[in-house]
């Protein structure tokens, strides 16, 4: 597995050093902006104004990062490919990574506030198909699901009631590793027709 140590900024913001990264925009909807930030190594970045919205980060590469925000002591964070983290809105910060390769992060920038209490489906995938769908974490804005199908495995009939961002972590039937899609509500049964396990992450937007 490729390990990199990087510093970078994760969004196009006023008051932020921008040459440390490139942005590959994927989607921009009323609910969210989705993009991949590719961070250059050995380039400390200062965000003077911070970030006004909450975000979900999915790390496409493994690495170690140093973060200094506010008056707190700098802390070191390690992450792995496919790890998902919540990044709350924040004030000014400085991030630093050290390594010899760029690092990529899929970022989901949440534009609105939570919609309030949501209906509960009797066919929720984490209930009727818990073998394949696990809750990574949940809060009032998102629910993050980790999806795993073994080769030739077939799931149960289930329902998705929310829009979701899906990241494919490996090559699988109908998708390549690192493909990103927005998928709407659906009731269906899924099957991995391939000869290898299928891994993906689904971020449901409330």
Model region roles, listed by residue range:
Residues 96-141:
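Surface-exposed beta-loop interaction hotspot
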Residues 28-31, 71-89, 173-187:
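Short acidic-glycine-tyrosine-enriched beta hairpin
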Residues 18-22:
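Boundary at the C-terminal end of the N-terminal hydrophobic targeting segment
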Residues 1-5:
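Positively charged n-region of N-terminal signal peptides that target proteins for export
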Residues 6-17:
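Bacterial N-terminal signal peptides
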Residues 62, 89-111, 162-163, 184-206:
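Ligand-binding loop in jelly-roll beta-barrel domains
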Residues 52-70, 159-174:
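Glycine- and acidic-residue-biased ligand/ion/polar-headgroup-sensing regions
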Residues 27-57, 66:
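N-terminal targeting signals for Sec/Tat export/insertion, comprising classic cleavable signal peptides
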